[in-house]
């Protein structure tokens, strides 16, 4: 998910590619077609995953490029809303959108986006990366709880069904777990 190019040095550029099918909140509600497809994710998650992958590699996320493929049925106001959402999310993460592409094609059934994130390596990350491969006995650090993303995703997608078996506060809380996605504070 994350790559460092050339030799390791402080301030080195690191890239991360994160792709996903984007859920559009629009009148055509194209997302309903693939509601059960777990690769379908909101724009927020694409950017957050990119930022998290960069942070996990020891880089500070600074910029991103966004490529969006749209079906012919998507209207310009929906594209503007999608880009506005992307700009807002990037700003929250202190990431500058520095470019990208938008393509419309009859071959596309629902919006697809790929974000390429760029980060700058810190001196500590350079030292760690220069040390070489991960070795037996090294620790794996988990900053959140296992199943966080899946719980939030499934609760949001299946809210109606879950409400028939569980109290509303429990389902709503699980669906809101996306607020914990960022690992940027822990990676700092």
Task: State where each predicted segment sits.
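Helix-biased detector of long, well-ordered alpha-helical tracts
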Residues: 1-188
């Amino acid at each position: 998910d994350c790559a460092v190019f050339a030799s390791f040095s402080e301030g080195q550029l690191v890239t991360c590619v994160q792709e996903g099918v984007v859920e559009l909140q629009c009148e055509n509600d194209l997302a309903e077609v693939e509601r059960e497809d777990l690769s379908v994710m909101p724009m927020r998650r694409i950017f957050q995953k990119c930022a998290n992958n960069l942070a996990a590699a020891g880089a500070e996320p600074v910029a991103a490029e966004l490529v969006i493929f749209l079906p012919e049925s998507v209207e310009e106001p929906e594209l503007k809303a999608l880009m506005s959402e992307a700009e807002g999310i990037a700003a929250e993460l202190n990431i500058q959108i520095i470019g990208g592409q938008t393509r419309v094609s009859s071959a596309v059934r629902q919006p697809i986006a790929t974000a390429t994130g760029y980060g700058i390596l810190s001196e500590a990350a350079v030292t760690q990366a220069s040390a070489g491969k991960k070795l037996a006995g090294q620790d794996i650090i988990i900053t959140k709880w296992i199943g966080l993303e899946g719980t939030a995703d499934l609760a949001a997608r299946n809210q109606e069904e879950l409400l028939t078996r569980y109290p509303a506060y429990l389902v709503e809380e699980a669906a809101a777990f996306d607020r914990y996605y960022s690992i940027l504070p822990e990676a700092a």
